[in-house]
Amino acid sequence: MRKIGNVILDDTCYQGRDLYTDGAIEDEMLEIARNVSPDRFNKVIGEKKSWPILYHFSHIRENILSWMPFTGKEKVLEIGSGCGAVTGALLGGAGEVTCIDLSMKRSEINAWRHRDSEKLKILVGNFQDVEKKLTEKYDYITLIGVFEYGEAYIQSQDPYVDFLKIIRKHLKPDGKIVIAIENRFGLKYWAGCTEDHFGTLFEGIQGYPSTKGVKTFTVKELKKIFQEAGGFESTWYYPFPDYKFPMTIYSDRRLPRRGELNRTEYNFDRLRMELFQESAVYDSILDNDLYPQFANSFLVVIGQDKFETETAYIKYSNERDPRFNILTQICQKPDGSRYVQKLPTGSKAEAHVSNIYDKGQALAPLFEKEKLYVNSCEKVSYGVKLEYLEGISLEEKLDTLLKEGQLDEAESLLFTYLHKAERLYGSQDFKESPEFIQVFGQAGLPEGLKGGMLADIDLVPANILLGKGKDWVLDYEWTFDFCVPAHFIMYRMLHYYLESDGKRHVLKNRDLYEKAGISREEQEIYAKMEQHFQKYMVGKHIPMLSLYDEISPGKLDVMEYYDRIRGCGDERKLQVFFDRGQDFQERDSFKYPMTRRGLCIDIPVPAGTRRMRLDPGEVPGGFKISRIRWRDLGRAAFHTNGFALGDHCYYFGGGDPQIILENVPREAEILTLELEALKEQEAVKEFWSRFAREENEKNAQIQDLKAQLKQKEAQIHEMENTKAWKLYRKLKPEGKGASSKKQE
C-alpha cells in the first residue's frame, strides 16, 4: 500500500504485472497525469491530436455521471475505473470513492490526476480477488463501460447475471448500480460504425458470430439479465451521441424530438461507413416510438427499488470558455409537473447563468410587440429556474412540412418569424461599437444596415415554441446589450435551420437569404462574424468536434459512391455510327440505353450504310460479344480495338472501345447485338495472363528465328570455305560495269 498525493493505492491483491496494457501510450498518459494539471488537459488534447489521449483525458467523459443527484455523503464503488476518466465526476459529488482496476499503470494515472483528493482510494487487482476483501456497503456501484466485459470478470455459465449477483452483496439496501453500456442495436452500427470493442462492421447487430469475450446487449436482453439477477428495478437513460462522450442525456420521461439527433461524428477511433442519413432515420424511429430500441448507448440505474430523481433530461453546453459552461435540465416532480433549470458547471460560469434572468426580464416587453413571450425565469441558489412549456418548436413544425412536401408552406412559415426578427431589431441605424467588435470582430459591414439593442442572436427556429395561442422564446442565453444588425439575427435563423440537418437542403435552392434581403456580401461577412462569435464563446478551449478531421480516420460515404456508380450505369449509352459515304459523323448516329451489365438489342440499319461503328463507352472490364448477326444474313464480320481474351471476350484497358463492321451487306436491315460486361478484376487478370503468354510466344519465336539465322550464317560460312566456292569466286564476273569495260 502506498500513497500518491492524498490518494491511497492499495496493491494487496495485485499480482505483480498488468494483464492488459495499451503499450507505450500508457507511459505517455502517466507523464501527462503527473506533470499536467487537469485544467490544462484540454490543451494537451489539442496538441497531441491522439485518440487515446482524447478518450482518457477529455472532460466530456465525466458528463455521464456529473449530473447525478449526489449529496456529498454517498459512498461509491467504481469498478473498472481505468485511467480515471469518470472518477472526477464521482469525486465532485460523492463523499467517498473507492476504485477497483486490474492495471497498476492505469491506477497510477488515476491517482496522479486526482492526487489532491482526500476521499479517493484505489484497489489494484483482479475484481474477483478484490471484492472478497470488501467490507463496506455502498450507496452506488458504477460500471461505466465495464459490464460488457462480464465474461472476463466472472468465470461461470452465466457471467453477466452472476456479475450483478456478486456486486449486489456490496450494496446498501437502498443502494443503486449504475451501468453505462453500448446498445447492441444502436443506430450508429446499422449506419456503418464498427463495433466498439472489436472494430468490425455489424459484429454486434449480428449477435457476435465471430468474436468472444465482450458482449453488449439490447433493451430486452438487459431487462432479462436484471430480472434473473434478482428482480432489479431499472430506470433508463439514453446518452447521445453515446455514453463515452455524452452531450445530451434523454430518458423515458423525456425522449428526443424530431430534428434533435443530428450529430454523426462518433468515430474518432476508427474508419466508418456512412450508409444512410442518420438524422432522417432517427426522425422516422421517433415517429414510431422506437427510440429506446435504437439508442446508441444506455445509462441504466438499477436497484431493489426504483431510482428516484426529478431529472428527466440533461443537456451539456460545456465545450466553451469556462465562463460560459452550463448545464440544462428538465425536471419532473412527483405530481408530474415540470420545470427547467440552468446551472453553471463551475464557479466561473455563475455570472453568466445569473445574467440569463436579467436578460429575460429585459426582453419580455420587447418581444411582446411581436406577440412573442419569454418563459418565466427566477433566480435560485444553484442557478436559474424556468417555466417548462409544452408545444412543438418552429424547427419541428418546419421539418413536418418538409416531410409532407409542403415546401411553399414551410418557406412562408419561416418568413413569418424572419419578419418578426426584422421588425424587432431593425429600428435604428447600425454602428459597430467596441463591445460589438469584442464579440463579433471588425466586420466591415456595408453602410445603411439597421440594427437593434437587446439582441437575442439565438432566436433560431429550435428556440421558438409554437404554443396554444402564444409563441414562446425558450432560450435567450446569448442576448447582448449593444446594437446588432437585424440581418445577422435573420442570417442565423436561416443558417442554423438549413445547415444543421441534411434533410433540409431541399430549401437551399430557393434563395432564402436573398429573399430575406441578405445580400451575398452580407452573407460572407455574417459567416465571419459567426466564426468570431464562436471563438469568443469557446475562448482558448478546444472543442472535441474541432479535432474530428485531425483525429478521426473519417467516413466512407457509401451512398455517394452508390449514386456515382448507379449514375454511371444510368448514363451509359451505346452510340452507333453509320457511314453512308461521308465517314462516321455525330449527326449520323443513334444512342441506345445500356446498363452496367450490358445490353441485347436489334439495331435498324439505314439504307445505303457502308460501314458501322459501335461505341459502348467506358467499359472498365471490357465485354463479351455474345451475339453479332445480320438478321437473315448470318454472323457479322467485325474488328475491334480491344485485346482478344478468347471466347468472344475483349479487354480495352480503360480506353474507348470500338467495334467496326466493314462492308455492310446492301440487303442488311437489322443488326442483332448482345454485349455482356465483364468483371474488371477477372478481365484484367486474364488480359495480363494472355499478354504474358503472347509475349512469351513472341519471344520464343524471335529466339527461334535468331537460332535459324545463326544456323544459316554458320552454313554460309562453311560453304564459303569449300574449294568449289573459292573456285566460283575466281571465275565469277565482277559486275556489269566490269563486263562492259572488257567488251570495249
Predicted regions and their residues:
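A short glycine-rich, Lys/Arg-flanked "PGG" loop and its adjoining helix->strand segment in the class I
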Residues: 158-176
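Catalytic activation segment of kinase domains across protein kinase-like and atypical kinase folds
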Residues: 207-208, 438-505
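N-terminal auxiliary segments of SAM/dcSAM-dependent transferases
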Residues: 1-36
